[in-house]
């Protein structure tokens, strides 16, 4: 098999394959030519060429999100790797595995006036789970076995119980384009520790006692579809003292759950003790609703258990008691194996009654519209969308409007809620559509978000299963509905940032 003449590059490619990474998004360049050649020549690797590095980063993110596996990114030296940073930070806060391969000059040439050269070492240090620096000038100073183990450790980190992005920066000398017949397999896999699936029973006994004696609120953030967790939560939601709140991006649906948090909290009396939980259980990633976050921070919650391996010290509600590094399905399955007692507190019933009233009021509210509004447009789109598709929601107003409507049965909801930026919504949705042609993928985007990421449309071949709906309101409509900017005289120019460009012209 033909490959790059550089042993270091061959070793890296073999290690990627050993850890199941077979898809690579390549951004064209010269310094990363040895990788481009090695990837292209390898029969087990599929490459996707994306010119704009910022778009490339989010396309890789969408692929990893859709497949549930690590995707590699590869770019040339200089500012190219900086353009990956928005996607890297999104992957970090979403716990999505990416392996960023940035080609570089050898360290001896950094900050000495050579072209297309910046300090790339540790460039992502605040938003990655691990990094490794390899330099062709220094490669022979360690054994092949040492390099194999270092790479294996890095790739394990990306795909551990707490997943996320890692960075491999590789200093390469010229010549860059030479090839050889590859004869050695450099792959080496290290043994992995299996994550725990259960709490020790004494710890679980304490939690069960608290469940039996308290008003319990379970809040689900952004998650992949999880039928097992949904089943276990359905069982818990049958108890009168347990309430389950979900958002569309939680991707679990059942009539026992409260799906539209902001709709339910509209007009909610936050001082009413009957609605305040004593025990808070959270799972998943980001929660869209600012109202529920503000409410829970001031609700006097006695204990908060955070379920999952990711970000164990993240104290969103300022009442964190303990992070439990189990998967949600394993944790709730163990809860249900124990004897829960249905206490007499009608906590669930009160919340559900509030939800039903809010839903009826919402119908009345929408029926009174006499002119076209963003909400009406969104409701019309919701009514027309078929089941069994992947619905991608761009950030700002779109993802918030979606939370005001009941989820469409069978639809999976996706959104870049790690950093909640508008910069990569189209590219992320496109990446998901590219690797899963069996599903229809629809993105709903505002005009500003769409224009910001319009280089995604440069990708070819463009997937036929990807549809894009742009809500054209000539600016950042979110600033008309959030407190503060709506009352500011600077709103139109500096916040809403009115613009006249039509997405149809792109």
Positions of predicted regions on the chain:
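A short, small-residue-rich loop immediately preceding and capping a beta-strand
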Residues: 22-25, 46-48, 66-105, 276-284, ...
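Conserved thiamine diphosphate
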Residues: 69, 116-164, 331-332, 483-506
């Amino acid at each position: 098999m033909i490959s790059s003449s550089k042993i270091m590059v061959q070793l890296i490619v073999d290690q990627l394959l050993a850890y199941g990474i077979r898809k690579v998004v390549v951004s064209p360049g010269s310094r990363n030519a040895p990788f481009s050649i090695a990837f292209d020549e390898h029969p087990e690797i599929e490459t996707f060429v994306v010119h704009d590095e910022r778009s490339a980063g989010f396309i890789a993110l969408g692929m990893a999100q859709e497949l549930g596996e690590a995707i590699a990114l590869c770019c040339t030296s200089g500012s190219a790797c900086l353009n990956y940073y928005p996607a890297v930070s999104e992957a970090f806060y979403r716990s999505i595995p990416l392996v960023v391969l940035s080609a570089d000059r050898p360290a001896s040439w950094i900050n000495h006036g050579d072209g297309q050269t910046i300090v790339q070492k540790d460039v992502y240090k605040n938003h990655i789970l691990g990094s490794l620096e390899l330099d062709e000038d220094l490669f022979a100073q360690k054994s092949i076995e040492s390099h194999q183990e270092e790479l294996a450790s890095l790739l394990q980190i990306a795909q551990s119980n707490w997943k996320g992005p890692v960075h491999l920066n590789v200093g390469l000398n010229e010549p860059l384009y030479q090839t050889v017949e590859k004869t050695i397999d450099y792959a080496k896999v290290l043994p992995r520790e299996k994550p725990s699936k259960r709490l020790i029973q004494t710890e679980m006994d304490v939690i069960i006692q608290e469940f039996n004696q308290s008003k319990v609120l379970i809040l689900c953030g952004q998650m992949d579809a999880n039928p097992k967790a949904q089943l276990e939560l359905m069982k818990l939601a049958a108890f009168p003292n347990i309430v389950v709140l979900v958002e569309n991006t939680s991707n679990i649906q059942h009539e026992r759950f409260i799906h539209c948090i902001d709709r339910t909290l509209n007009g909610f009396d936050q001082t009413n003790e009957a609605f305040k939980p004593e025990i808070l259980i959270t799972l998943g990633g980001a929660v869209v609703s600012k109202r529920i976050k503000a409410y829970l921070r001031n609700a006097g919650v006695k204990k908060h258990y955070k379920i999952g391996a990711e970000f164990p010290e993240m104290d969103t509600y300022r009442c964190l008691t303990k992070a439990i590094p189990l998967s949600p399905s394993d944790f709730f399955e163990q809860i249900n194996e124990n004897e829960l007692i249905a206490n007499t507190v009608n906590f669930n019933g009160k919340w559900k009654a509030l939800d039903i009233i809010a839903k009826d009021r919402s119908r009345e509210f929408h029926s009174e519209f006499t002119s076209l509004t963003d909400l009406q447009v969104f409701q019309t789109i919701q009514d027309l969308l078929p089941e069994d598709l992947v619905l991608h929601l761009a950030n700002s107003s779109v993802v918030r409007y979606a939370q005001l409507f009941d989820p469409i049965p069978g639809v999976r909801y996706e959104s870049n809620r790690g950093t909640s930026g508008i910069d990569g919504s189209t590219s992320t949705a496109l990446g998901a559509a590219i690797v899963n042609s069996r599903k229809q993928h629809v993105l709903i985007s505002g005009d500003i978000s769409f224009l910001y990421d319009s280089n995604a449309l440069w990708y070819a071949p463009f997937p036929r299963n990807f549809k894009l709906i742009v809500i054209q309101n000539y600016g950042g409509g979110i600033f008309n509905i959030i407190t503060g900017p709506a009352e500011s005289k600077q709103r139109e120019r500096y916040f809403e940032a009115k613009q006249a460009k039509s997405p149809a012209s792109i």
